[in-house]
Design a protein with these regions (language model features):
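Short acidic/polar alpha-helix capping motifs at helix-coil junctions
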Residues: 1-3, 17-20, 32-36, 52-56
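A glycine-centered beta-loop-beta connector
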Residues: 27-30, 35-51, 93, 101-117
Length: 143
């Protein structure tokens, strides 16, 4: 199966200079916990999650009013193209201990996101359980 068969499209993005308050508001309004961070040309330079905000800013007593996305984002973007196989997504999640992979078009711009839940639609229950366990046991923050 190809990524394009499972990808959640219409991905929202945010710029690295956006405020943390702006990100939090967007996440709350859209009921999402993950946003690709893009440069002025729309290409991904990182990702930010609600957990990144908590761990990298709030837990460290950071100034939330003045904080910017680039202070909390993960800079190493895991991405695939829509025409790639879902096995690559599963392998990326396992290798990097992540639960979401960005889907980018041929020009490198975000077009969607594949989550661990999306993998559940593809894999048999036993395999999903093993993949989820591996990802959750090894979840780490990387920059």
């Amino acid at each position: 199966m190809r990524v394009q068969d499972f990808v959640k499209k219409n991905v929202r993005t945010i710029g690295r200079e956006a405020s943390i308050q702006e990100v939090a508001r967007l996440m709350a309004d859209e009921d999402i916990g993950f946003l690709p961070v893009v440069d002025s040309s729309g290409k991904p330079v990182g990702t930010i999650t609600d957990r990144d905000i908590v761990v990298r800013l709030i837990a460290k007593g950071g100034d939330l009013k003045g904080a910017r996305v680039e202070q909390a984002m993960t800079k190493d973007v895991a991405s695939v193209r829509p025409d790639e196989d879902m096995d690559k997504v599963a392998q990326l999640m396992k290798d990097r201990k992540i639960s979401r992979v960005l889907v980018c078009d041929q020009g490198g711009k975000p077009v969607g996101v594949i989550s661990l839940g999306d993998l559940a639609e593809r894999h048999e229950e036993e395999e999903v359980g093993r993949t989820v366990k591996e990802v959750k046991e090894g979840t780490t923050l990387t920059h």
